[in-house]
């Protein structure tokens, strides 16, 4: 293959050999395409070969399901998915817009995020998820690694591998979701305990954990289970305290009531994205982060 890997029919240019992202199911590379005098960049998600215990039909269904979800979503805070193609080695590849700023995990690790950036990225994530929920889709794997920065002050939600359609466009009622998925520190408590759950509320929980992590560069607890002492203490203090520990660590003070509602251990008490966006504190937060 040499130092470059070309996508079938050169529609999206040539891929760099070095990956910009690696996950359990795929590798992501940058593709360069010259269009007259302008260079266009795409992110190419190259899916790994199917597992031995998976049929070809199951494998293709999984890939096309993810593409069918992601390609119908069009919002400033959701990654734009362009195409699903095969390369010359018959690898399935998803073509997406390229984000020059890397992922939020890298930005948190660097420790360079300002308070206005943190608040704006939080609001933008809520807006992106609110849009997805309005389309009947829950993400179910919100974490810093799945939030990309475009370099112009916008956050983009990516990776719809475990997303769930909880309401078809012709339906009025929502379906409950099943299955434990996502990364343990961001998983809502009901996912550990219940067979079925409202996936919208799982997303709300995860966004709140991301906000905490952006601010403090650490997680509030290892897992939202009663076997975790920090989480157990939080649950016991929740009913009696206006700001149960560790929420007093968050600033400004005005954000704490909202975060408490988003991190309600009982999903019946947790707020949905409509309520989050109506919060007086969040209403005055900017939709765009000015890059530091």
Language-model segments: which ranges?
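Short, small-residue-biased leader/transition segments that mark boundaries at the very start
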Residues: 2-6
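Glycine-rich ATP phosphate-binding loop
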Residues: 27-51
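Short beta-strand micro-motifs within the conserved protein kinase catalytic domain, predominantly
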Residues: 80-90
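C-terminal lobe of the eukaryotic/viral protein kinase catalytic domain
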Residues: 87, 218-267
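A conserved loop-to-beta-strand element in the N-lobe of protein kinase catalytic cores
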Residues: 88-97, 105-106
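Activation segment signature within eukaryotic-like protein kinase domains
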Residues: 121-122
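Conserved activation segment of eukaryotic-like protein kinases, specifically the C-terminal portion
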Residues: 175-191
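Terminal C-lobe "cap" of eukaryotic-type protein kinase domains
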Residues: 265-269, 273-289
């Amino acid at each position: 293959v040499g130092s470059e890997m070309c996508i079938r029919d050169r529609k999206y240019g040539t891929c760099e050999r070095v990956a910009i992202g690696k996950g359990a199911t795929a590798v992501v590379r940058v593709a360069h395409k010259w269009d007259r005098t302008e260079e266009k960049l795409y992110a190419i998600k190259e899916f790994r070969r199917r597992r031995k215990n998976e049929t070809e039909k199951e494998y293709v269904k999984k890939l096309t399901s993810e593409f069918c979800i992601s390609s119908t979503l069009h919002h400033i805070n959701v990654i734009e998915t362009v195409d699903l193609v095969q390369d010359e080695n018959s690898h399935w590849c998803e073509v997406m817009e390229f984000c020059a700023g890397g992922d939020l995990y890298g930005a948190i690790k660097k420790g360079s995020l300002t308070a206005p950036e943190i608040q704006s990225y939080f609001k933008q994530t809520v807006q992106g998820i609110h849009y997805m929920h309005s389309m009947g889709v829950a993400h179910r794997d919100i974490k810093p690694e799945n939030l990309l920065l475009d370099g112009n002050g916008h956050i983009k939600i990516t990776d719809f591998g475990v997303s769930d359609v909880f309401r078809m466009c012709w339906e009025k009622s929502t379906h409950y979701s099943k299955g434990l998925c996502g990364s343990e520190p961001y998983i809502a408590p009901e996912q550990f305990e219940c067979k079925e759950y409202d996936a919208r509320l799982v997303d709300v929980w995860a966004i709140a954990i991301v906000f905490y992590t952006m601010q403090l560069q650490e997680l509030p607890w290892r897992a939202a289970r009663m076997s975790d002492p920090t989480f157990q203490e939080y649950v016991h203090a929740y009913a009696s305290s206006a700001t149960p520990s560790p929420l007093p660590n968050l600033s400004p003070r005005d954000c704490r009531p909202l975060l408490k509602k988003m991190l309600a251990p009982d999903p019946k008490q947790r707020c949905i994205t409509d309520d989050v966006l109506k919060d007086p504190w969040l209403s005055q937060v900017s939709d765009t982060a000015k890059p530091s």
